[in-house]
Each structure stands twice: as C-alpha cells, then as structure tokens.
Amino acid sequence: MTEKPTESDEAPAHTHADEEITPDAAPDFTVYNKEGNPVRLSDMKGIPVVLNFWASWCPPCKAEMPDFDEIAKQYEGRVAFMMVNLTDGQSETLDSAKSFISSMGYTFPVYFDTTSEAAYAYGIQSIPTTFFIDAEGYFVAYYEGSMSGDTLLRGISMIYAEIQ
C-alpha cells in the first residue's frame, strides 16, 4: 500500500500515479450481500472502490458511518463502496449487523465476511480500516481508525479523477 490520507488540512502530496514504486494489486475475496449472494472484489473491476472493514459493536466504526453513507450516495455509480462487516458469528452476527444498519437507516452497500476471508486477505488487525482501490484493482491508500468526511473525500480523490 502506498499512502495514508491524513486528518490534516493538507491534501496528500501525491497519488500512486506519481510514485516510483509499483502499486500492489488488491487481493480478491468473496463476501456475501444481505440476500446471501456471493460478491467478489473483482466484480468491481473498472470502478474505483472504497473498501471499509467494520462491526456494529465498534464505536469508531459507528462514528464514521454517517459520513460514509452520505458520501456513498454522492458517488453512487462512480465509486463502489464495499462496507464489509466482520461477521464472525460470535461478537458479530448477521442479525446484529443487519439490525444495526436497518435501525440507523444506512443505505450504503453492506457485505458480510462470514468466513473471515476478506479480513485475512487484508491482514485486518483493528477496525475501522479503509482501503482506497483504483479502477484497475490496485491499492492507492488506506486509513486505520475512524475518519472524517473530509479525509474520506481526500482518499476518494486519489482513486477518482473527477475530484482530484
């Protein structure tokens, strides 16, 4: 991974296109939508992706969700949001995650990592963690912890040309 958007007022110094290193391809994985159908990250190829790992019991995850929901609506059809719930069946179940999303009225796409395949592929150690993946399927930036709407927009600007 190449760059971490910051909470500072300054925009990131460069995007992956300006870097001297070879960007890493984002690992593919399978998660499940609310209907139980499998969805792969590779299904999103050709569109930039904001990939967020979260759980309903996580206060920092809950704090950033209103901004994610609002911004996901603004970029619908242009940037894919994959809000991946860490559904381990113990501290987080399908029912608890679905109930939380429903009670808050969030409309962003939620996916369930019931096998921990995605969390393992991305080495998730803490949540929330967000990855910004370009339309070609390469990591551009990441952020660990709860992020503000401004930081989310800075990350999107690194993968979506219309707001760079």
Regions found by a protein language model. Name each.
Residues E20-P23, D28-V49, K73:
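A short beta-strand-turn-helix
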Residues F132-Q164:
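Thiol-/selenol-based redox modules, centered on thioredoxin-like
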Residues M1-A26, Q164:
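N-terminal targeting signals for export/organelle localization
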